[in-house]
Amino acid sequence: MKQTLILLFTLIFIGCITGKEIVQVWSTLPDTDQLLINKTIDLKVSPEDVKELVEIFPDQTCQTVLGVGAALTHSSAYVFHQNLNSVRRDSLFRVLFTPEGIGINYTRLCVGASDFSFNLFSYSEKEDFTLRNFSIAEDYKDVIPMLKEIISINPDIQIMASPWSPPGWMKTSGSMIGGKLRPDCYDVYADYLIKYLQAYQQEGIEIHTMTVQNEPEYGTAAYPCMDMTADEQKLFIRDHLGPKLSASGLKTKIVLFDHNCDNPDYPVSIMSDSIAKSYVDGSGFHLYKGEISALCKVKEAHPDKNLYFTEQSGGGWAPDFDQNVRWYVGELLAGAMNCWSKNVLLWNLALDENDGPKNFGCQNCWGVVQVSSNGKVKHNAEYYAISHYGKVVQPNAVRLVSSGEALKGVAFRNPDGSFVYLAVYHGKETKVIRFKCANTMFDYSFKPGEVVSFKWK
């Protein structure tokens, strides 16, 4: 923290005494020893002829973006809570959740058990349509204490919640694994979800958005899951959850789908029902299948509704650190936000040295950070990808239209009036690229594979 403040004041001082306008630059090179290198360049162009141009159009505004982050799963909360003492945890949380660190401003909670919890559990274990014994006791162990610590550091963090499964007694399988929601349980399940939101509200925790079902097209997993067709989700939202949530007085917004980009017709068909659509804020997507352009297709069909990117995990199946940083920034962050997403969420915030604790699900998923049982913290590629966004893009920034084919990138204007461009250069040779934003221009020499975040006024 002290070093960050000294650097900031030094840069301000230098700018004052020289009178130069500067561009703040954060650079990551394929050489993993050069990660998030902070430097400045002059806000001017070189006399040489530069053929490649990226133009940012400050008057062509798109969506307001809320932030990036990852899920505080039960496993993530556990490793934060149990593997770090309070002093080291506070230090890590300030790195993760403040602008002086990597600027995480969005997280996701699991409503009950998921593939990253210790066991199968719900908040109402015995069949009871009155939900008299509803309790979030399991969440008091790790999730709620950790979430409260995070909120104390970043009170404005956005929170999404997603259920993996209703209680087993509400399902045709009689288990949290597999099956469908029983038709006679649509109403009580809506009550169950609202009770969850109310229980968190009583703890002083506002949940801003809630998806209806995590990965509704994957009902055959060995961990908590449920198959839910688009028609079933439409009926559940239109006739049960939507009316009940509206009547509850809660401000939580409903996000439908919450699955892969290979089936944009799922959310499009639900929102084709005007009543169901009236209860919905937008659609959520993962990118384990399909193309990120699916978000653009949904926006074209329903331009009045929002888009969210709700989950993506890295893991042992993609071990190339440098390639992962480039993919996350260029394909996922820039790709999703250029297709109107208001956020980007990765999967686990943290896991231990054994990629867990886990619950019959992914055996080699990685967190944004690894927090080992001995308290050692390791930063994964996801950490650096989030950093390239969070260090420069403020909450409630507005995406701007930009053009140029030399880079994978996305542009923003921050609430303080500064401009941002995130860029991934896939070229194999060093290349100078010129940036133009209204009457402002500057040049930057990209090295092969470089990931860069620019910020200027």
Locate each region found by the language model.
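C-terminal beta-strand-rich structural cap/linker in extracellular carbohydrate-active enzymes
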Residues: 445-457
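Bacterial Sec-dependent N-terminal signal peptides
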Residues: 1-21
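Carbohydrate-binding surface patches
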Residues: 391, 402-438, 449
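Conserved, mostly hydrophobic/aromatic
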Residues: 70, 103, 159, 210, ...
